[in-house]
């Protein structure tokens, strides 16, 4: 059941393997277009930090490199969107959907997505970026063992999501191995085709 308030929401899903630079590009898009930026990972980490019973359960799952149940993530996203939609109806949703069911359920229960930005980069580059980030991030999922699991999860579960939206001609695939600015220029150019200016 969709919420009436969310009928006008325009959603862009942002996908890419761990360390593909999604977060950095989302920050730049927010600066330029003033989108609402929701990261499923940030919402989950905030829940973990709150120390709630649900947060403790989520922390254990994230440390094991497992995917958090669909309903939990969807509820957190929907709640955040309802709070923000009156100010701005454009949303960048980062790191979601991780698997096909999540995308289908989101579109059924929240709203259809406008397009999907897919940041494509080799595992070697992503691994180097993640290990460099691990030196300063204090994130429970930035360690060698969990990184390998996160790549496997991405390959097995998220790639079918990208294929699904490709069939609807909604995917913007961006080579994310260049500089931050070069990547951003490409994203900007492609978004214009979906009426984002």
Swiss-Prot record:
CDD domains reported for this sequence: ADK
**From the Swiss-Prot or TrEMBL record, what is one GO molecular function term?**
adenylate kinase activity
**Binding locations of ATP:** 19-24, 133, 178
One Gene Ontology cellular component annotation held by this UniProt entry: cytoplasm
EC numbers? 2.7.4.3
Matching InterPro entries: Adenylat/UMP-CMP_kin (IPR000850), Adenylat_kinase_CS (IPR033690), P-loop_NTPase (IPR027417)
Report keywords, A-Z. Answer: ATP-binding, Cytoplasm, Kinase, Nucleotide biosynthesis, Nucleotide-binding, Purine salvage, Transferase
GO biological-process terms attached to the record = adenine metabolic process; ADP biosynthetic process; AMP phosphorylation; purine ribonucleoside salvage
Pathway noted in the entry: Purine metabolism; purine nucleotide biosynthesis
Which parts of the sequence are annotated with region: LID? 132-142
Locations listed in the record: Cytoplasm
This protein's superkingdom? Eukaryota
The first-level EC class reads transferase
**What reactions does this protein catalyze?**
AMP + ATP = 2 ADP
CC cofactor: Mg(2+)
Q: Where does AMP bind?
A: 40, 45, 95-98, 102, 139, 150
Key word Hydrolase present in the record? no
Q: According to the UniProt record, where is the region NMP?
A: 39-68
* One family name in Pfam for this protein: ADK
PROSITE patterns for the chain: ADENYLATE_KINASE
Q: Function, please? A: Catalyzes the reversible transfer of the terminal phosphate group between ATP and AMP. Plays an important role in cellular energy homeostasis and in adenine nucleotide metabolism.
Q: Which family does it belong to?
A: Belongs to the adenylate kinase family. AK1 subfamily.
How it assembles, according to the record, is: Monomer.
Xref: HAMAP family: Adenylate_kinase_Adk (MF_00235)
Quote the record's domain comment. Answer: Consists of three domains, a large central CORE domain and two small peripheral domains, NMPbind and LID, which undergo movements during catalysis. The LID domain closes over the site of phosphoryl transfer upon ATP binding. Assembling and dissambling the active center during each catalytic cycle provides an effective means to prevent ATP hydrolysis.
Protein name per its UniProtKB record:
Adenylate kinase 1
Q: What is the lineage of its organism?
A: Eukaryota, Metazoa, Spiralia, Lophotrochozoa, Platyhelminthes
